[in-house]
Structures are given as structure tokens and as C-alpha cells.
């Protein structure tokens, strides 16, 4: 790990080997919190490794020990907890937390995992080691990007300023909304890295991306709405590095990292032979994709020269006949994690919330002091 060491030699391997999936009922428990702490350490070390452009042992360890599927499962589990258990918990009469830190830890867990996945998915072998859970991850990314498009039509995430009149729980809910926005942006990067592997993805995964979710058209919507850009007091701002930053006039034509991720994903999905053979260019898809022509300026092509090929593809598409929507007669795999979690916990959301209220989210002062010392 060179000079930049957060974890001692051998410590990272122990942490990776210990990663496991938890039942939803155990979210926030002692063992779960220890794993959250481990993930934070692995996260920081992975970022240090990537920044130093040296060997990246965290990514190698996750692949070697087959832990990418575990991370995907934990990601979807905490997403489901936030959607199914958290709202029930907030409605319980007895739920009057003196301290919201233990709940913040759970809400933050999804951000921790997607951040780690974004760091390591840059490497194609990580994508391959996800095995069948790549379908679940594609679905997860699609859910996040759909919410991002929807959110861009109603003002984006709440502002960062705290209100003097907010209760701790109201502040936590605002924090969770802001975090969801950042999580969606990370999911965009993960999806782009998955499209880098389009030539080695299974037919089921390609079909999921191109037919079930029609990701090329969703990506066009993202470019149109650009939810990571906004105008405030006549000045352009972009969401970068975890907060909104005003863009200098001289930098406004410069391609943002997030716009770049969308363009690269579109390039991969529309120009790779494997994807082109699977994508049905209906009249709707043609209409959506031709909107890209207006964005393909000389300034953009100077920054991403490969997009000249995409420009040529669109010129050809403008003259091409559209295809009727067809259903491939392929025996397809389907994502299993979310459906399994739904089945295992159906009708139990209230019981899980009550259990966690008693055993997890009513900590003693000593518990709170211990948790506050951990990285978050």
C-alpha cells in the first residue's frame, strides 16, 4: 500500500473476509455497526490507493474473496430498510429519539457502500466478479437514475442550510434526502463502469439494460435535465465534491465529470457491437436519441473526440427505418435480491421497526459515546 496506509498489512484482508449479509431485522445491531465501521475503513483505503495510482489491494481483495455480491446485497438491503422500515419507525408513537446518530449511521450506510463500489468498479474484473448480482445492481442504478430525473423536475435536493426550527428528526430526514441525491450520482458512475464491460455482460444483463429499462433513453433524459447543474442568482452552479459550486465563466464550456459519465455510457450502449445487436430502435427511441445531436457541439467533441463516432451513428439513425418493438425469446435471468428480501419480510415491517426501536435505536449514553468515536 506504499506510504499512504490507513490499514495495516493484513488488516484489510481480515476486514474483507469478515464481510457478510445481515437480515433486515439486524440492521443497526452491534455486529452490523462493526461491519459499517469496517466498510468505512475499506472505503478510505480504496480512495487512498486509487488517488496514489498504485496497486489497489482493496479491489483485489474484494474480488479474491468473492465479496462484491455481498456488497451488492447489503446495498439493496439498506435501500429497502430506508424505504420500508424507516417510514414505519418514524410513525411509531414511542419513537422520540434523544439522539439521531444511530439512525444516521444506517442512513449513511447506503452511501458508504455505493462509494466503495464506485471506487472499485473502475476495474473490469470487479464487474465480472459481481456474477449474477450485476442484474440486481443494474436495477438498483436504474431506480436511482429514475428518481434523479423525477427530482430534477421539482427543484432538486433540499438546501444545506439548517433551520433553527427543525427537530433532530426533521434535520435527519433532510440529510437523508441530500444523501439520496449524492447516492444517485454515485450510481450513475457505477452504471457507466458496468457499460464499460458491455462486451462481456450476459445476454440477460444486456436485455435488462436495453429492453427492460431502455437505459439509452433514460440517459438522454439525464443529459436534458442535468440535475447536477443549476442556476442561482444568474450564476451556473454544479454539484461537485459533495456540494454546489459556482462555475467560473471561463469553465462553463468544460465538460463536467457527471456529463462525461453519461456520454461514455451512451457511447458504450449505442456503439458496441454486442449492444447494437440487442437494442430495438423503435420510433420512440429514435426520437429520443436524435435529441443528442443538439448537444454534440465542436466544443464537446474537442473534449471527448470519440463522440465523433456517436455523431456519425446519429446521422445514420436519422435516415434509418425504425423497428417495431420485439420481445426476444431468450430464457432470461431476473434480479433476485430485492424480491427475496420482499418475500422474507413481507408483513413484518412494523414488527422489525418495533424490534429496532427497543433494541437498536434507544441506545444508552455509553453506546452513543462508542458510536460517535467510529468513522462515519
Regions found by a protein language model. Give the residues of each.
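Extended alpha-helical interaction scaffolds used for oligomerization/partner binding
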Residues: 2-375
